[in-house]
Design a protein with these regions (language model features):
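Conserved "HGTGT" condensation-loop signature of ketosynthase/thiolase-family condensing enzymes
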Residues: 1-109, 113
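Active-site-proximal alpha-helical scaffold in enzymes
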Residues: 112-121
Length: 121
């Protein structure tokens, strides 16, 4: 039975509480040297800011994909266990996010806040 989750034109409500079971973070060398450095799950090297990709856009997608993979592993769940994924990126069209997570086949809410994505979600 489908449940109507809409509350308004741009709002939804969930039938049960929302929670975060795990998180995953992938950053470059510079971010790891800051005050939060010990909290990141994976750090690139100063020799490869692109994480093996041939463009910044592909690198950002790779970081998104890796972060989701780390999160799934830490939570001990599969992609099909996740109902929604909230993601945003520094590209104005959510290209890096959508390409980075598309193999997981999780419904994606694209957030357009760039650096404020964490707060928005």
């Amino acid at each position: 039975m489908a449940v109507n989750q809409t509350m308004g034109r741009a709002s939804i409500s969930y039938g049960s509480p929302v929670f975060i079971k795990a998180s995953g973070s992938v950053v470059g060398q510079m971010e790891s040297e800051g005050p939060l450095g010990s909290y990141f799950d994976k750090v690139g090297t100063d020799k490869d800011d692109l994480f093996g990709a041939d463009s910044w856009e592909k690198a950002e997608s790779a970081l998104q994909k890796e972060a989701v993979g780390i999160t799934l592993q830490k939570a001990g769940i599969k992609a099909e266990d996740i109902r929604y994924l909230f993601a945003g990126d520094l590209l104005g069209q959510n290209i890096a996010s959508s390409f980075g997570v598309m193999d997981y086949e999780i419904p994606l809410f694209g957030l357009y806040g760039a650096c404020s994505t964490c707060g928005e979600s």
